[in-house]
Amino acid sequence: KIKVAIVGVGNCAKSLVEGIQYYKENPNDTVGLMYDDIGGYKAADIEFVVGFDVDRRKVNKTLVEALRASPNCAMDHVTEILENGSNSQGCVKRGAKVYSGPEMDGVAPHMLDYPAEVSFRTGAQSHISFQDIVDLLEDNDVDVVINYLPVGSERASEFYMDASIKAGCHFVNCIPTLISTKDSQRVEQKFIDAGLTIV
């Protein structure tokens, strides 16, 4: 299994998790997959084990509950998001939880003026510490951290990158920031020095 942590449990994360469950439930349907086997791994080999978010409607919920919580509104690719188990085609670890991460620059001020059904609602609780996040990554044996923070969350993204490095996790950045340009060569070098990958 490839154990994955999700930073930013929003629409993109919902679509990814549901998509992986769909391909796990339908192993002969590879339409939509560029490659159904990469290095011997298939979609069914991915398991989501922990999440981090700032929205009070998601924090302290299970990952399964948070993925379908407001303001997420991406179309459903499966009827129900399932936890992994002996009789289940789910790809979410049983009991996987969403923890409160730091807001930093991850919430644009103007977003707080939008209606609740289309925007963030922060203030669930104080965010957990950097070391708590590192410990959660280690305790859940996370292999890869996926960054789905909102566009422009550069400081928050670097915070999670540093936690990933300290916990020995690879990092997939799914947002357009300067993280993967010349300005970020310093960050990239930190991953290289740690023997880790950043994509």
Each predicted region: which residue ranges?
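Residue-level detector of anion-binding/catalytic polar loops
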Residues: 143, 170, 197
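Rossmann-fold NAD(P)-binding glycine/threonine-rich loop
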Residues: 150-166, 174-197
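A short glycine/serine-rich beta->alpha loop
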Residues: 3, 197-199
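N-terminal glycine-/serine-/threonine-rich beta1-alpha1-beta2 phosphate-ribose binding loop
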Residues: 1-160
